[in-house]
Amino acid sequence: MPSELTPEERSELKNSIAEFHTYQLDPGSCSSLHAQRIHAPPELVWSIVRRFDKPQTYKHFIKSCSVEQNFEMRVGCTRDVIVISGLPANTSTERLDILDDERRVTGFSIIGGEHRLTNYKSVTTVHRFEKENRIWTVVLESYVVDMPEGNSEDDTRCFADTVVKLNLQKLATVAEAMARNSGDGSGSQVT
């Protein structure tokens, strides 16, 4: 359970963590779970996270993302990502595994490309919190991945954790700026 969460948040998120962010690990694989508190409405945060075709909106290390000409965002669709230089990756082909707008759950798998993240699967959930007339969002993101040959579990987790944490921080920055700029606190949504 991420240490960034308050006891109240932990209690409320327990079932979601059990359902979406708990993995049966095969030998040679590892997983991790991260949380990010965002001072913006969950509807706005979800409008960013759900855009499988525009991950560069909040993901740091993506140079570009392309989808098929007649792209339809649905489970099974794919995207081709070009990663910025300096990382141990060049390209990534990713498949949308889940997109549940009602429960605000999305997830993808890396199914090809030039990278070292074999069998990488990620799930992201967006959660609403309200207390004393304040509304905020907690985003949970978890992953499971095979450890590359020659890398330890710590090496693998350190790399993947760094990428996930930086992406979640950028998501918070983008969503909070959108909420501030909307003037009414509800925030505009990504279209």
Predicted regions and their residues:
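Short, highly charged C-terminal tails/helix-capping segments
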Residues: I17, Q169-T191
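Intrinsic-disorder/low-complexity, polar/charged segments enriched in Ser/Thr/Lys/Arg/Asp/Glu/Gln
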Residues: S29-R37, T78, T91, V105, ...
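Beta-strand/loop substructures that line and gate deep hydrophobic ligand-binding cavities in soluble
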Residues: S109-L166
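Structural signal for hydrophobic/aromatic residues that build the beta-strand cores
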Residues: V45, R79, L96, V126, ...
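A short, structured loop/turn motif at beta-sheet edges
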Residues: P42-E43, N70-M73, I98-R104, V126-V138
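Glycine-rich portal/gate segments that line the openings of hydrophobic small-molecule binding cavities
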Residues: R50-T118
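Hydrophobic ligand-binding cavity/cleft-lining segments
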Residues: M1-R74
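Solvent-exposed residues in well-ordered beta-strands and their adjoining turns
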Residues: R37-P41, I82-I84, L99, I111, ...
